[in-house]
């Protein structure tokens, strides 16, 4: 299932004449500009440049429908079946290679210099760090991640920036129309994520990126991104229990699925893993003649006083993996000399800059609420993290606890995390701050695992929630739409899952009270019929507060929920 929500559009967008003109600039002029401004860019043969240019012009000519029409077409590819339901023949993995052939991408994908990353948690952050490092060396990068939080174009970054709406439309309709014309009963239209992966391949091929960094969507072995047969290097981020209905109910089985991205003789890196998972990774590496190296977390010393662009102690694990992945790519493809970490007292300057400037929404992100900031003496700050597994929930709780304590002592509402500005209020003491939980998770998750990990880790750091709010997501899983498509309040919404979450939370609170533990106990909880109502309640609480109180709201349990909150508070 996919939560899919897009920033609102007020007008239909078509390919502009400027974009079409760019495609029709004389080839010699474009090539001169290309080499002048991208010196490290790896040149392709002239014939390939001409071929690529013609394909782009053809692509643009076939486009032209509005953004909303593209989203509607994309929505038609979303299946309402469970991910674990393999009854549909359209789910067969080998179909991915048929689609590549239909889109004439077979040769293009062989030429791509791919970094392929799987894992349970941290793979998106690892890919983001890796892309930022390589881009800081002057190479042209393409980054494919999932899910998106606000706009589907977030999944496709070119040189660190979301693909433009114009280019997205051109590439989208080129792929969609061609597949519509060429698919049949035996080779049906690809499902939602597979289409997006194919679209990424098309975008990166046409844009001639030097490095394509691909995050696995689910698992590894049968993921659409695994159509890449000869990546430059592979990475496995931290493993844990997630998607067990698909990947298996043991860490060994899950590790086996993730290791499905290993390719014969292609170097691979992973981070320290539980023993069961590591044994399987090593077995799979041996079977595929892969040199698998375990990378230790990055240390602050190597960063020469700089902070990582993504906050949280767990990001040092992801950054360590990213450094190894980027190093191999720069050595093999960039033909640069990069010393090994054991030889470094500090990282090279461009590595440090890449790690420090990396950004990814919805991961350890701090966003002060601008609406309340200018209207009240109080303060409302959102701490957003899309954690949705027991292990990532603990990491999220640790980050939140450390962040709120540091923010309350320093008087800021968060360091500049992922581009969020701090508050202008003066110093806050712990006595004038209240922590609130805003939570939802998908019904395939087990709240009896997630909520105790979250609550206990926060309590360990002396952070107790004054209140817990449970809400349904605004996003719908069967449609890619705009904000205008989403009702702010649906009286018919089924809240049975939210009441289940509340019951689990209340039982945790009650057991704590019965145990008469020291410290302040967590307070009451409430279920809201919609997320906008919950946000309004939070803002009203700040407005009605008789004292200057900072309300620190942890939003977690689902990246879809995080995306919905970001969209609402930035309206």
Swiss-Prot record:
Catalysed transformations (reactions): (6S)-5,6,7,8-tetrahydrofolyl-(gamma-L-Glu)(n) + L-glutamate + ATP = (6S)-5,6,7,8-tetrahydrofolyl-(gamma-L-Glu)(n+1) + ADP + phosphate + H(+)
Gene Ontology cellular-component terms listed: chloroplast
Coarse class of the protein's main subcellular location: plastid
Cofactor(s) needed: a monovalent cation
Keyword Plastid: yes
Compartmental location: Plastid, Chloroplast
Coiled-coil ranges from the UniProt annotation: none
UniProt tissue specificity: Expressed in both shoots and roots, but expression in roots is higher compared with shoots. Distinct expression in the quiescent center (QC) region of the root tip. Also expressed in vascular tissues of the cotyledons and hypocotyls, and the first true leaves of 7 days old seedlings.
Residues given in the record as Mg(2+) 2 binding sites: 243
Stored PROSITE patterns: FOLYLPOLYGLU_SYNT_1 (PS01011)
Cofactor remark from the record: A monovalent cation.
Keyword set, alphabetical order: ATP-binding, Chloroplast, Ligase, Magnesium, Metal-binding, Nucleotide-binding, One-carbon metabolism, Plastid
A single GO BP: tetrahydrofolylpolyglutamate biosynthetic process
Enzyme class: ligase
InterPro entries: Folylpolyglutamate_synth, Folylpolyglutamate_synth_CS, Folylpolyglutamate_synth_euk, Mur-like_cat_sf, Mur_ligase_C_dom_sf
One GO molecular-function entry: ATP binding
Function: Catalyzes conversion of folates to polyglutamate derivatives allowing concentration of folate compounds in the cell and the intracellular retention of these cofactors, which are important substrates for most of the folate-dependent enzymes that are involved in one-carbon transfer reactions involved in purine, pyrimidine and amino acid synthesis. Essential for organellar and whole-plant folate homeostasis. Required for postembryonic root development.
Family classification: Belongs to the folylpolyglutamate synthase family.
Protein name listed in UniProt: Folylpolyglutamate synthase
Species this protein is from: Arabidopsis thaliana
């Amino acid at each position: 299932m996919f939560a899919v929500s897009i920033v609102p559009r007020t007008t239909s967008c078509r390919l502009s004449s400027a974009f079409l003109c760019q495609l029709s600039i004389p080839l010699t002029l474009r090539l001169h500009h290309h080499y002048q401004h991208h010196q490290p860019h790896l040149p392709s043969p002239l014939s390939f440049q001409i071929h690529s240019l013609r394909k782009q012009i053809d692509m643009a000519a076939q486009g032209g429908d509005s953004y909303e029409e593209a989203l509607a077409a994309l929505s038609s590819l979303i299946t309402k079946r469970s991910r674990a339901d393999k009854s549909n023949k359209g789910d067969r993995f080998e179909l991915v290679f048929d689609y590549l052939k239909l889109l004439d991408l077979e040769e293009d994908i062989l030429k791509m210099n791919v970094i392929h990353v799987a894992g349970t948690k941290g793979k998106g952050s690892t890919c983001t760090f890796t892309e930022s490092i390589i881009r800081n060396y002057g190479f042209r990068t393409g980054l494919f991640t999932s899910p998106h939080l606000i706009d589907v174009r977030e999944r496709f970054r070119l040189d660190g920036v979301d693909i433009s709406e114009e280019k997205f439309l051109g590439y989208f309709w080129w792929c969609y129309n061609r597949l519509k014309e060429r698919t049949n009963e035996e080779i049906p239209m690809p499902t939602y994520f597979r289409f997006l992966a194919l679209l990424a391949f098309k975008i990166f091929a046409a844009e001639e990126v030097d490095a394509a960094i691909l995050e696995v969507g689910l698992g590894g072995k049968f993921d659409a991104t695994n159509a890449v047969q000869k990546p430059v290097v592979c990475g496995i981020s931290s493993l844990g229990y997630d998607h067990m209905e698909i990947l298996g109910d043991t860490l060994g089985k899950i590790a086996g699925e993730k290791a499905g991205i290993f390719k014969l003789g292609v170097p691979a890196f992973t981070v320290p893993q539980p023993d069961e998972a590591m044994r399987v990774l090593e077995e799979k590496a041996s079977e595929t003649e892969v040199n698998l190296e375990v990378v230790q977390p990055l240390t602050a010393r190597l960063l020469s006083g700089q902070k990582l662009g993504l906050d949280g102690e767990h990001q040092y694990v992801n950054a360590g993996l990213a450094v190894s992945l980027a190093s191999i790519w720069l050595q093999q493809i960039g033909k640069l000399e990069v010393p090994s970490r054991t030889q470094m007292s500090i990282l090279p300057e461009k590595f440090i800059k890449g790690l420090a400037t990396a950004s990814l929404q919805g991961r350890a992100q701090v966003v002060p609420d601008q609406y309340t900031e200018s209207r009240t003496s109080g303060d409302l700050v959102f701490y957003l993290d899309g954690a949705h597994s027991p292990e990532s929930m603990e990491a999220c709780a640790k980050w939140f606890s450390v962040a709120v304590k540091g923010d309350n002592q320093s008087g800021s509402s968060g360091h500049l995390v992922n581009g969020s500005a701090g508050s202008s209020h003066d110093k806050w003491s712990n006595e004038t701050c209240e922590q609130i939980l805003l939570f939802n998770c998908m019904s395939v998750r087990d709240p009896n695992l997630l909520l105790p990990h979250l609550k206990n880790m926060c309590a360990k750091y002396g952070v107790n929630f004054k209140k817990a709010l449970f809400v349904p997501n605004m996003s719908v899983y069967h449609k890619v739409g705009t904000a205008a498509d989403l009702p702010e309040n649906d009286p018919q919404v089924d809240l049975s899952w939210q009441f289940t979450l509340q019951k689990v939370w209340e039982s945790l609170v009650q057991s704590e009270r019965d145990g008469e533990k020291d410290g302040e106990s967590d307070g009451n909880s409430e279920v809201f019929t919609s997320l906008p109502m919950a946000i309004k309640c939070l803002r009203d609480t700040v407005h009605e507060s008789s004292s200057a109180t900072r309300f620190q709201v942890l939003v977690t349990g689902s990246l879809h929920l995080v995306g919905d909150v970001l969209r609402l508070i930035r309206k």
